[in-house]
Amino acid sequence: WQRQVSVRNDGNAGTGAYKTTATFVKPNFLREFDSFISSFEIHNDSDPEIGAIVASTSYSFPLKNGKRFITSYAYGEREYVEYTDSLRDISFKTHHILGQFEKTIYSSKNQAWNAFVGLNINRTDSYLSGVRSDLVVGASDKGWVRTGHLKAGLNFNGSYKTKSWSGSIYGMQGINGISEDFQRADFAEDGIIPGEARAVGAKGNLAWTIKKGVGLNLGMSGQIAMNPLFNSMTFGLGSNAGIKGLPGSLTSGDSGWLGTSELVLTTWQKNKKAFQVVPFLGAGGVHTDLKSVTTKDAVGAGGIIARFIQPEFVLEIGWV
């Protein structure tokens, strides 16, 4: 088994700034070339009170002719423990199921392209003082909503001399029949029709070793919605999306963009130990069109990180 534990202070507002994650990976779990991943995440505030718990598993099963099937399940609970007003009585439970086929369509010494198509199903239950309540779009007065969508596209990665890159191009299509009748009626009040929700997007990352001890990492992504989307199809901004110095999930919208950059300066290195200074900058924006109402938001952050690398752990201290 391969194990990794991380402790960070870029959790989400309300559920707690401190985020502890434990990840376990087992290659060749049931057969050769398969893999099993299990992850546990806890958010807490400084009291400490637990504001969120997320548990997930993923299994990748190799098929013939460069094909793979990936299935995953995630369960989460969220409470706003940092607040002292009525928001503290709000809580959510979420389920996410994914089934995805992948196929390697091109592979060479320095690059690879994979095609994928996956089915995503999500359910959210919302509560006010422990009673199911209409707190999310689509939930109606029954207090729960289920949605599903297809996502298909291409993943790619490659390298050449001092540069390496990766990214994806994708399209998403909502599925009408996964939501209940009362949920579709609730969505319609906001101009959302699950079966007509669709979007396209792309993302890319570039790592460039400029010279010994100096590296540059760049990232860009964007999404365009053709019609109003439900929550699981939206474009999110925060540290989970790559913008360092922000809460994990700060804002989201149907369409959006983001860009990130960091300069990695390795000031000392010996064997497998190193000390790095990393200035970083990131920004993004989102917007949503619902009937005659348009909402927009933009965020950004910049700062510097001191990173100490040991064979068994990595320590980062940052200023934003």
What are these model-derived regions, one by one?
Residues 1-70, 107:
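Outer-membrane beta-barrel initiation region
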Residues 2-3, 29-36, 64-71, 107-113, ...:
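Repeated loop/turn-to-beta-strand initiation elements of outer-membrane beta-barrel proteins
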Residues 9-15, 44-48, 84-90, 137-145, ...:
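Outer-membrane beta-barrel domain signature
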Residues 60, 68-217, 223, 287:
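Transmembrane beta-strand segments of outer-membrane beta-barrel domains in Gram-negative
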